[in-house]
Amino acid sequence: MSKIEKMSIQGVRSFGIEDKNKQVIQFFTPLTVLVGPNGAGKTTIIECLKYITTGDFPPGSKGKTFVHDPKVAHETDVRAQIRLQLKDVNGELVAVQRSMICTQKGKSTEFKTLEGVITRIKHGEKVSLSTKCAEMDKEMISALGVSAAVLNNVIFCHQEDSNWPLSEGRQLKVKFDEIFSATRYIKALETLKKVRTQQAHNVREYQVEIKYLKQNKEKAREIQDNLQSKEKQLAVSKENVKSIESQLEPLKDRLADIQRNLSKVMRLDNEIKALESRKRTMEQDNQDLEEKMEKVFQGTDEELNGMYQNHQRSVREKERKLNDQQREMDRACKESQRLNREKGELLVQQGRLQLEADHHQQYIKTRDSLIKSLAAQLELDGFERTPFNQRQTSNFQMLVKERQEKDEAHANQILREFSEREAMKQRQLDEMRDKKTGLERTIELKSSTQSKKHTDLKNVKYELQQLEGSSDRLQELDEELQKTERELENVEKSCNLEALRGEVLQLQNQKSELDRNVRKLDQEMEQMNTHTMTRTQMDMLKKDKADKDEQIRKIKSRHNDELSLLLGYFPNKKQLEDWLYSKRKDINQTRDKLARLTKELVAAEQNKNHLSNELRRKEEQSASFEEKVFDVCGSQDFDSDLSRLQDDIEKTSKQRAMLAGATAVYTQFITTLTEENQPCCPVCQRIFPSEAELQDVINDMQSKLRLVPDKLKSAEGELKRKEKRKDDMMELKPMRQMLADLKEKEIPEIRNKLVTINREIQRLKNDVDEQETLIATFASEEESAKACLQDISLMERYQMELRDVERKIAQYATKLQGVDLNRTVQQVSQEKQEKQHNLDNVSGKIELLRKRIQDQQEQVQQLKSAVNELTAEKLHISSNLQRRQQLEDQNVELTTELQCLAREIKEAREQLFPLESTLQKLQQEKQELLQRKESSYREAQEKVNDIKEKVKKINLLTKDIEKYSQDGKEEFKEQKESELQELIGRLNECEKLKEKVNREMVTIRQDIDTQKIQERCLQDNLTLRKRIEELKRVEEERHQLLKEMGQMKVVQMKNEYQELENKSESLKTNHSLALGRQKGFEDEILRFKKELRESQYKEAEEKYREKMIVMRTTELAIKDLDIYYKTLDQAIMKYHSIKMEEINKIVRDLWRSTYRSQDIEYIEIQSDADESVTAADKRRTYNYRVVMIKGDTALDMRGRCSAGQKVLASLIIRLALAETFCLNCGILALDEPTTNLDRENIESLAHALVEIIKSRSRQRNFQLIVITHDEDFVELLGRSEYVEHFYRIKKNIDQCSEIIRCSVNSLASYVH
């Protein structure tokens, strides 16, 4: 058995929060007695035991009021801790600790539980485990060996709940159910019942599902059989198709061979025609070339090639020289470019150097100006005139440096003087602050002590004030107590509880009648649910019928227009399949015709491509000839241009001859006029009248003579150019003839042929398009019909299923014949709701009356509690009057100490005031000193910084001036100017070289142009000989192709092709028929497979078997649940009967041995069957009540017994329950058991408790804990041999509870 050994309490209710206030109590065996006045903290010990074992707070407390109040403790956080040491049911030592914290936040407090700790001794070592509250509660229940309900309601029952056995019926039932642990089993029974109901509902659903699954299984089997039949037919059809294909394959191969040979014949014919056309073209081209050539070379090919190669070598040599001159020109150009770049770079450098020279002069002027200004500022002599030389500049820098050092020394001296004065002033300030701080600290400490003493004095005065009126208060309490007792007596007389109970009984009868009506309606609902299932199945079938009708309508609506347009009517499946077969035959015939037209179109397009290529070649040749003629002539009027050119050549030749003779004529005329004494005009023989006129004529002739060479040269150049152009035009004359033939004859002929063949191709294309359109139309119609075929098949299946559904609907309609369908489920449900509403109203009225009864009972109880509270306050005031003298002495002592502290604080404050004024004065003096120091130092420093800044600028300018001279920038500038002049001279020489090379290149180009004219003539001779050779090869190739074509037996091949094609067409027709049948079988197989893949047929047999297994196993499970439900219910009832008999026996014995009056023989607990339980619950539940037996009559004790009888009955019932249910835990705590008992019953209770202890003392772990304020009751218990010590609970001077261990022998002296 489990046993508690000791417990420590800290920070709970009135128990202090300091470690010194921790209270420890050790529990004795078999009896522990706790004595103390009201409010001392006795009940707190029971509350701590209950909390440490169950985790439940006292009634009306959520934890905040359970912990010591932070406002009373003058703390923000208050921690509470309870520790319990016990032995569990196995005798092992266990230590348990629970902690709490309460935090003051503004006006509200916040409560929180901390992690608990359980410590066990294992193998001689302590093992601690931190757990959460819920886990610790389970551990404690396991360790003590009793349930939480027994701990709360029996072992550690709170004083406020101690009378629960006589509480209201519903609350009493909950308590007893928890103690009996019946709640869990009742819940288990309810769960079993719900599971059984749900499973029964599932079985009904399974039956409906199985019915449909069976239909689906049979339908799936039928579809599977049809599928196998179609697959066999498909295999036979595939064999037939393969046989036809094996016959077609060699025919196709032979037809392909013949087709290739015929294509080859067509290709050979086209090639022969192309070669003949090419031969004619080549012959004409050769003839045109011979006519164009001025001279046809008569030598051998080797001689012609030798001359051509020699001529090419001469041209290449001249071109090489031209390239050399070009390279020389390129080198000269590159050199000129390089020199120009260097010239540009030198010009840029010259500009940059000139800019630096200008800056240098500006720096010198700026520096001298700054030196002159600063020298005047510093009053330095010798620096009035600029410019300054190097010596003057150095002398100036030295003088300025000395002046700077002098000014800086003066500024530092000022800074040091002020710093010394500042340090002295700071020391005075520190001394004053130390004195002031010491006095303030003294005042603060004494003020704090004064505040504490004031608080203590206030508390003492408050207690004295409370005690002032204690005597008067005792008299008032006596009067209030008498008044309250009279009021209690009047209330008990005025209560009309019996009338209210009678009204409740009448309403309960009405409730029972309504309950029977509701059960009757439930039975009617259950009966209607059976027919509802049949109705539901019939509704489902009707819905299925409507769905199938809608599907058939949709299919017809979707395809009616299309099929009517194709066939002229809406067909069935067989009619549609026949139409598809005929349509496939039309498509095959059209495709064969299309193939023939395509072959003819390909041949025509090949011929067109050949003619197009030939036309393109001729047009390109014509364009090339026109371009060459235009390049030479400048227009397309070749003959007119040639005639004009010949006239121009004759005119230019005459002009050249005239100019060539003019030189000799003018020379002779000038010689004659110069040498003769009397010259005359050489033309008219006129003598010149004067020398001046003669000289004018001579000058005019000399002037013309000087112009003759240039004009002669120009005329010769013009003549050569025109002759060259004439040669070029003569070379183009054969080309001109060829161009005319191309434009007038060959190109028009080819274009006419192209027009003819284009018309033929267009005709063939139209035919092909027509056949393709026809095929597309046939194919579209076929696809449309095929798309409809699946829906037509589906529609036929829907029609079959529709007939099956209509048959089932007729069967269900037969089943429902004779059933009254006027009263619907909704009507019955509505009537049930009305009855249920009335039932709820009656139940509400009953609860309202019970509440009134309870209110009256509570009013009586409140008055009784008021009587108890007044009695307790009276006892408390009596005990407090004994502390009055001690509080008066403490008042005098605190008053004296406070007067002394006030005097000392006043003296310290008087010393503090002059110190504060002196401290402020010193701080002001220090601040003024700092301001003067900062001002003086700033003025001196600004003067020094100004000089430094100006010297810095002068030094920077001097540095730049010196750097310019040191870098030699002036000499470098002169050097670059010299280099620029030299570069300009080299650039002029390079330009002269370029002019020379250019003249030589012009001469070489003229020679090359002359050589190329001769080269063209040789090239034409070579071209002519190559064309003749090519013409021979073309003729040989044409004869070869004619020979090859004659060996191919074209007529025999065409006859064989026609015969094989007819045979192939026959086989193809049979093949198409076989394929059509095969396609029909495949469509059927696909449709059957698709149906089998549908959700209702997929694995239909497996689903049926599985659902059947589930239903059978569920039915077996329902039977097992019924058996288990009945067995568990019977076991609960039997256990309940045994325990109630055992409890009532103990209650009777304890009552007879304890109660001293003769009005009640004994009491017992009666458990009556609950009349409100409906038949649908199928089990009994109990309502509990405590009755008292008077003679042969059993009366409810609740409302009929006195307060003392109520307390005694509740105590005895708790003792009986502890005896019955605490087999593993011998602990029982009684809080104020003598409340409301008279002296005789107190004595008998003490005797009964001693007897119980005596009977249980043989159990080592039996522990009875008694808490009381009645010391006479303790003395009665102490007369037994089981009590040697007891605990006295009281409050110390800090109003914190203390637990003091006392001997029983000291009790008598304390009482008396």
Curated annotation (Swiss-Prot):
This is DNA repair protein RAD50.L. NCBIfam families: rad50. Residues 203-342, 415-558, 587-628, 712-1070 form a coiled coil. One of its GO terms (cellular component) is condensed nuclear chromosome. The keyword RNA-binding does not apply. It is found in: Nucleus; Chromosome, Telomere; Chromosome. GO terms for biological process: chromosome organization involved in meiotic cell cycle; DNA double-strand break processing; DNA strand resection involved in replication fork processing; double-strand break repair; metaphase chromosome alignment; R-loop processing; telomere maintenance via recombination; telomere maintenance via telomerase. Belongs to the SMC family. RAD50 subfamily. Component of the MRN complex composed of two heterodimers RAD50 and MRE11 associated with a single NBN. Component of the MRN complex, which plays a central role in double-strand break (DSB) repair, DNA recombination, maintenance of telomere integrity and meiosis. The MRN complex is involved in the repair of DNA double-strand breaks (DSBs) via homologous recombination (HR), an error-free mechanism which primarily occurs during S and G2 phases. The complex (1) mediates the end resection of damaged DNA, which generates proper single-stranded DNA, a key initial steps in HR, and is (2) required for the recruitment of other repair factors and efficient activation of ATM and ATR upon DNA damage. It catalyses: ATP + H2O = ADP + phosphate + H(+). The lineage of its organism: Eukaryota, Metazoa, Chordata, Craniata, Vertebrata. The zinc-hook, which separates the large intramolecular coiled coil regions, contains 2 Cys residues that coordinate one molecule of zinc with the help of the 2 Cys residues of the zinc-hook of another RAD50 molecule, thereby forming a V-shaped homodimer. The two heads of the homodimer, which constitute the ATP-binding domain, interact with the MRE11 homodimer. GO terms for molecular function: ATP binding; ATP hydrolysis activity; double-stranded telomeric DNA binding; G-quadruplex DNA binding; metal ion binding; protein serine/threonine kinase activator activity; single-stranded telomeric DNA binding. Its cofactor is Zn(2+). Binds 1 zinc ion per homodimer. Zn(2+) binds at C681, C684. Gene3D superfamilies: 1.10.287.1490, P-loop containing nucleotide triphosphate hydrolases (3.40.50.300). Mg(2+) binds at T43, Q159.
